Amino acid sequence: MSEKVNLYFTDYNCVKLLKITAMIIGVPKEIKNNENRVALTPAGVMELTRRGHEVYVQSTAGVNSGFPDEEYVAQGAKILPTIEDVYAIAEMIVKVKEPIAPEYKLIRKGQIVFTYFHFASEKDLTEAMLKS
């Protein structure tokens, strides 16, 4: 995890100090056939970066959803050229669909993968996730 960030929240005129851990979040381009969505929009990136998180988006990850790289950069994301780069730097990967075989080797032990998983139909995926 990256550095600790102090955030102040007000609730009924009471100020509370909460310690949270900022994360390094990666958004790879979806490589599953016919998947054109992206896991985070530029607006989502803005919300995360405002809260102290670092967001790395693979180049052209949002293009098929109508979001060019420049929109992500304008909201605080950093663009990386390859899927390997995104997986290598991120503590948490955010995806629309479950990882497919070429991605299995990219997932590191302890890395969080935030996506929809359907383990019942994918034995290889289940085994790969258990190993990571």
What are these regions (language model features)?
Residues 4-5, 19-20:
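Polybasic, lysine-rich low-complexity intrinsically disordered segments
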Residues 20-131:
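Structural/interface elements that position substrates and couple domains in central-metabolism enzymes
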